[in-house]
Amino acid sequence: MIQEKEHKSVVFSCEVFPPKRDDDIYQIYKTLDEIKTLKPDFISVTYGAGGSNSKKTATIAAYIQNICEVEALAHMTAVGMDEASLRALLFELKKKGVENILALRGDKPRTMSQEEFDQRYFKYATDLIPEIKKNGDFFIAGACYPEVHPESKNQEEDIQHLKQKVDLGLNCLITQMFFDNNAFYSFMDKLEKAGIDIPVHAGIMPVTAAKQLGTSVTLSGSSVP
C-alpha cells in the first residue's frame, strides 16, 4: 500500500491517462515500462468522465501493480457511479491486487443537467468514501485545492468540506497543481489549524503547451505567476 511510503521525506509519483482507443493501451504499457525506471513511489491512473474508462483504469492499474511492481493508485469518481458499479469496480481492483484509490467527485458531463446530477446515487467524494471503506481494506486518497476549489465560496468553506472527507476516513491528500509555493505553505498552515494532520502530497505538472496550461489552471483554480 502507499501507506508504507508515507514515512519518506519525499514521495514521488506519476499519473497516466487511459487511452480512448483500445489499441493504444499497449503504448501506455510501453510508457509505464519507461516510467518504472524512474522508481516512482506510486503511479496513479485517471478515470474517464462519467466512468467512461473504468475498465481501462482497472486494467492499467493492474499492470502497474503486478507487472511494473509499483504501487498503483486508481482514480474513482462519484459522478457516473452507482452502488452496483462501485461494488463491481472495487471487487475487480481487489482481485487484481490494487489496494489504493483516489476518491473524487469527478467532472459533470456537459450533457448532464443539474437535475440529473441531483438524482445520482453518488454525487461527491464524501458519498464514495464510506462505501469504499465498507467494501474492502483500501488505502484512500483525496484531492485538495491549495488556492480554493473553483466552486467553493471561500477557502474556509473549502477546508470545512475537506475536513469532512478526512473525518470519513481519508489516508492522505494530493493537491491539485499549483505554481505559488506561498499559497501552498499558507494552505498547509490552515489545514493544521483545522485539525487535518494526514500526509499531503504536492501536485505539480510540467508545462508542455500553453493550451494545456490554460485548461489545467481553470480546473485546478491555481494562479499563474
Regions found by a protein language model. Name each.
Residues 11-27, 72-84, 141-157:
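Active-site mouth loops of central-metabolism enzymes
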Residues 1-14, 21-22, 131:
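N-terminal amphipathic alpha-helix/helix-capping segment at the start of soluble metabolic enzymes
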Residues 10-18, 43-45, 72-76, 101-103, ...:
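Hydrophobic faces of well-ordered beta-strands that scaffold small-molecule active sites
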Residues 39-60, 108-120, 171-185:
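Glycine-rich, proline-tolerant flexible connector loops at the mouths of alpha/beta enzymes
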